[in-house]
UniProtKB/Swiss-Prot annotation:
Reaction(s) catalysed (UniProt annotation): L-glutamate + ATP = L-glutamyl 5-phosphate + ADP
PANTHER family associated with the record: GLUTAMATE 5-KINASE (PTHR43654), ISOPENTENYL PHOSPHATE KINASE (PTHR43654:SF1)
Single GO biological process annotation from the record: L-proline biosynthetic process
Name of the protein in its database record: Glutamate 5-kinase
Gene Ontology MF: a single term: RNA binding
Residue sites binding substrate per the record: S54, D141, N153
NCBIfam families (alphabetical): proB
PROSITE patterns attached to this UniProt entry: GLUTAMATE_5_KINASE (PS00902), PUA (PS50890)
Length: 372
């Protein structure tokens, strides 16, 4: 499986806060210079690179003299606004020493939830990569709200991997990879070298939360690998403290945990749907509709829906669940929640009579539906 790493043409590299800051005392410029040297070496070997960089909040905290991460959103956003300036300048100057150009891109979930903005972001990123520019991406913490935040840069990195159709996502962390148990408490814990991203056994060993400076624990990294797998990308979760880790991965060394995609590539629109994490409501299906979606790959018709939950507008994302509450699919609805309430359980040819008009015969078309 390691040939998937050595042969990967396009990498998304995510570096966490703990690897970019000096124990919370601001940005570690020396450490950043080491990362840049490794990435430049990869680029010289023909690898196309996109960097997802944490560290803005941590850098801002240092400049403000804060020793612990604040919980109030406005304080976090203030720290991010201050720290982002330092972060992007540090990356720019360090890459410039090697004659490499960088570009800053700040994203929110809204940017990727809207189809038009998603396509614009994808076009911009691909253009930058084509111009031999290294994009440096972070979440736009200054304007984001709880409702539209990615939650962590692991998730953001996975969505970026989808955007640019990366072959490999490398998540650099303060652990050497995923273990069979917590190595801090269990001396018998063993490193998991390779696994399928969708292996349910991984959930049991991925517990825990992020550190004081960051938001993402091992569970978020596992979720990120599964999201990246939707577009066919492999993911390596590996320790950033390992000397020359990127070069050694490129050389085929068996470092960290390599998680392989569980299925083939999704079509471009389905990739976007897979990364569309914000849902606005729920449709409860009957057994026949579950079969139609899961086995027959058909569209969801009103007749197969038993209940509508939540408030949503036409074109928004909803969750489709089985009678037992198990999530079956997600998709973009053709009718609002109020409209759906009036037509569920009814045949499609009754929609016009019930609403006075008919937009689509399906509640969710199969092209706008992804199984989970």
């Amino acid at each position: 499986m390691r040939d998937k790493v050595t042969g990967a043409r396009r990498w998304v590299v995510k570096i966490g806060s703990a690897l970019l800051t000096a124990d919370g005392r601001g940005l570690d410029r020396a450490a950043m210079a080491v990362w840049v040297k490794q990435m430049v070496a990869l680029r010289e070997q023909g690898v196309e690179l996109v960097l997802v960089s944490s560290g803005a909040v941590a850098a801002g905290m240092s400049r403000l003299g804060w020793t612990s991460r604040p919980s109030a959103m406005h304080e976090l956003q203030a720290a991010a606004a201050i720290g982002q300036m330092a972060l992007v300048q540090a990356w720019e100057s360090s890459f410039a020493e090697h004659g490499r150009r960088t570009a800053q891109i700040l994203l929110t979930h809204d940017d990727l939830s809207d189809r038009k903005r998603y396509l614009n972001a994808r076009s911009t990123l691909r253009t930058l990569v084509g111009l031999d520019v290294i994009p440096v991406i972070n979440e736009n913490d200054t304007v984001v709200t709880d409702e539209i935040r990615f939650g962590d840069n692991d998730t953001l990195a996975a969505l970026v991997a989808n955007l640019v159709e990366a072959d490999l996502l490398v998540i650099l962390t303060d652990r050497d990879g995923m273990y069979t148990a917590d190595p801090r408490h269990n001396p018998d814990a063993e490193l998991i070298h390779e696994a399928r991203a969708d292996d349910p056994a991984l959930d049991a060993v991925a517990g825990g939360v992020g550190g004081a400076l960051g938001r993402g624990g091992m569970q978020t990294k596992l979720r990120a690998s599964r999201l990246a797998a939707r577009s066919g990308a492999h993911t390596v979760i590996v320790g950033g403290a390992i000397e020359q880790v990127l070069a050694r991965l490129k050389a085929g060394e068996r470092l960290g945990t390599l998680l392989a995609p569980e299925r083939g590539l999704l079509a471009a629109r389905k990739q976007w749907l897979a990364g569309h994490l914000q849902t606005r409501g729920t449709l409860v299906l009957d057994a026949g509709a579950v079969k139609a979606l899961s086995q027959d790959r058909k569209s969801l018709l009103p007749v197969g829906v038993k209940a509508v939950q939540g408030s949503f507008r036409r074109g928004e994302m909803v969750v489709c669940v089985a009678p037992d509450g198990r999530e079956v699919a997600r998709g973009l609805v053709n009718y609002s929640a109020l409209e759906a309430q009036k037509i569920i359980g009814q045949p499609s040819d009754a929609i016009e009579k019930l609403l006075g008009y008919v937009d689509e015969p399906e509640l969710v078309h199969r092209d706008n539906l992804i199984l989970v």
